[in-house]
Regions:
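ABC family nucleotide-binding domain
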Residues: 1-213
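Conserved beta-strand-loop-alpha-helix hinge in the C-terminal portion
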Residues: 217-228
């Protein structure tokens, strides 16, 4: 599903040049749950942004679904993103002015899904994540754990092949963190490929693989011990 070859990302200003990723080679198969760990500033989020087609590499190759996508135009990246990738962020990234139902529905609007189908699919997602009683509430009326479950529901509403999660439990207490990890695990068991950046060794163990980055390079890539 995913393969990078000598992937490099360099950030430049007039005064300094910073190498965020240094010849990263990873291969991720369909159906895997991969946790990415490492200290702050090691390149975890940079790698996730490139894998999610939110940024371009400075060098190397990136293959997604057997296509070399590193030189794609913004329109090509956008089309590939909206049809194949779901995102879950640490800060939830919900729109405060929209209800929970409307937040979850939003990606379907970009896909031009008919109204009747949107309603059915949104309600199905809300039921799955125990959010139906909250569908007419606004994000600020929900707990952190509930907001993150809304974010996960929004990420899966388009039925993506791949979910990218950047510190999805970072703003949550342990109980709500476990809820989110349980949701991601269930999605993975149903066949969705998941790549998750985390600082937590405990949550990293939910992955079938754990990749450690340091100074922009992969230093270890080992099998995890999935939580039961």
């Amino acid at each position: 599903m995913i393969r990078t070859n000598e992937l490099v990302k360099v950030f430049r200003t007039e005064e300094v040049e910073t190498t965020a990723l240094n010849k990263v080679n990873v291969e991720i198969k369909e159906g895997e749950f991969v946790s990415i760990m490492g200290p702050s500033g090691c390149g975890k989020s940079t790698l996730l942004n490139i894998l999610g087609l939110l940024d371009n590499p400075s060098g190397g190759e990136y293959y997604l679904l057997d296509e070399e996508v590193s030189k794609y135009s913004e329109r090509q990246r956008s089309n590939l993103r909206k049809n194949n990738i779901g995102f879950v962020f640490q800060s939830f990234n919900l729109i405060d002015e929209l209800t929970i139902h409307e937040n979850v529905e939003l990606p379907l609007l970009y896909q031009n899904v008919p109204s009747s189908q949107r309603k059915e699919r949104v309600e199905e997602a809300l039921e799955r994540f125990n959010l139906m009683p909250r569908q007419n509430h606004f994000p600020q009326q929900l707990s952190g754990g509930q907001q993150q479950r809304v974010a996960v529901a929004r990420a899966v509403i388009t039925r993506p092949k791949l979910i990218l999660a950047d510190e999805p439990t970072g703003n949550l207490d342990s109980a709500h963190g476990e809820e989110v990890m349980s949701s991601l695990t269930q999605l993975n068991e149903e066949g969705t490929t998941i790549i998750m950046v985390t600082h937590s060794p405990t949550y990293a163990e939910y992955g079938t693989r754990i990749i450690h980055l340091f100074d922009g390079s992969v230093v270890t890539d080992v099998k995890g011990k999935p939580m039961v």
